[in-house]
Amino acid sequence: MKRYTFLTLAAAGLATIALTSCLDFDSPLDTLTIDQEVVDPTVHRGDPAHIDYNISITEEEFDGVLATLDTYLRQAKGGQYAMRGGKNGDFPGEHAYQRQYSLGPDNYAQYTTVPHYDFMYGTLQSSYDISVEFNPGPNSSYLIVKNAMVPLLNHPAIDSIPEVKAMYLLLFDQASQEITDIHGAFPYDDFLTNKQTAPFTYVGAEHIYKTIIGHIGTITDCLAHYEARPDWYKAKLQRLMDDNFDVCQNKFYGRTGVAEWIRYANSLKLRMAMHCVKAEPQLAHQWAEEAVAAGVIESTDQEFGLYGYQLGFGHPLNMIWISWGDARLSASFESLLMSLGHPYTQGDYPFFKNNGGAIVNTKTGEVLEPDTRIVGLREGIHPGMGQSAATNPMLNYSVFDGDYMAQAPLYLMKLSEVDFLRAEGAIRGWNMGGAAREFYERGIRYAYLFERSEDWQHEMYDALVDDYIQRAEAVPYTYHDPLGMVADEPSVTKIGVAWDEGDSQEVKLEKIITQKYIAAFPNSFEAWVDLRRTGYPRLFPVLNADEGDGTLRYGDIIRRCPFPDTDDASVADIAETGLEALGGEDYQATRIWWDKDVPNF
């Protein structure tokens, strides 16, 4: 299928007519607030989850609705970018992305470690340290999504174009699922219905999950009705979708219709089903089989995300890792990849690079010469000071190759995630439309993070993946810290890669989640969920775990982020409804509804 490329360096018709409020583009601590241009001063509070897809409309009325919603649509488009590090209606950028991912979840998933503690607007003493400056980062991005999409969802005119309402409800709900998994409870109902002022009523993960699953049924019913629409309506809707939805690849392939949106919705349902397999095993089974039967993502051209190669922006992590020196490969990820001989570490041009400069052992004086080996930092270690390798040797630890990362998509839903979900469902005995091995091996083949339309980006991976899939045993590996700050640590990865039907369910699950973890990089949201709900992949214990809120000890992992808001009104709301909705105290060790301390099988 031919793929069309649209390279734009400026965001023409950018999503939001917005002015920044107290935003410093040189600061990693942006407040991420948006003051919307007020065209219609009315605050609409409609029924955002009600979608009447049988509604009829004339061509003239359709054009009138578009004129009425023009500002709202452009504003809502910015919410798509905010799902992956955008702000102010702009494409994803390094400041917002860093606050959303790099200063928290990326470390909790143990993809990365922060190599210096000092930032312009805050400090991070170790991985689980609660920074009042950085802890709100993911929620700040979520509020941008909410502020961009909710006014459109509540505007009465959007009911006349129900497909667009359905699509934005789906996007809002994915963002809501992700922030639920970070904090465990928030005022989802009040936010969705555009409530403007406190008090806000917190609801818990169980309520949010079950509400979203109900929405997905309505959304897919609405989109299935699209085929019954008249041709003029389909043509106008297609132009509207091409102009307003950058997360769907249809316009890049010259493709029409909404079939991919249905697959995306069902894939989200499958994800959420697996999240709650310990909390609601029978319901999880039902939801997962319903999702697969209705059709999930089956190919890479059906994936959803933000594609910098097509849209004209670079991946924010290049600036964060390479230019700023604010993140380095974690020792856990190093050990895992090296134990498995993963393609990211192999070949003439591996994705992860060797140490960037000499590293001198502080105890023995031994020197690791530049460009010797891939080396990561232990999670939880006390980082150095400053962003110069001349004074902070932690900056010489491994980074990725920026040429590969520059054009990497920022996924909302990736084929490999769906395949690994189906593989997990299959080993649980669920009808996933195929065998676990089939999904597992396809998941690995398409796990790479590189831009798919550029062959040179993934040729290295493609050349190595066949041997990788057949690797039956892990390679013996010991992590050695060249600075001598921590003792040597043998790899905790003991499984191979090759699928073996004779393996136990537990070993099969470990293989699936381990490969899913690698495939998700750098999207730490889902990786951290899987680590909490399954205990996989096996990673090194986080050092200095007790330096958070005091509820974690060595060997524990962080189960959630504390509530992000500390203003008086929010504190009152949390006391009134937040803790009850959470089901526990506002601690890092408190488990979210789906995170049950029970066996995987």
Regions found by a protein language model. Give the residues of each.
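Sec-dependent bacterial lipoprotein signal peptides
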Residues: 1-21
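Membrane-proximal, proline-rich intrinsically disordered regions
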Residues: 22-106, 543-601
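Extracellular glycan-recognition regions
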Residues: 23-28, 135, 536-537
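Charged, glycine/proline-rich intrinsically disordered loops and linkers
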Residues: 37-55, 231-245, 366-385, 456-494
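Structured, solvent-exposed acidic/aromatic patches
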Residues: 111-455, 501-510, 515
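C-terminal functional modules
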Residues: 448, 457, 461-601
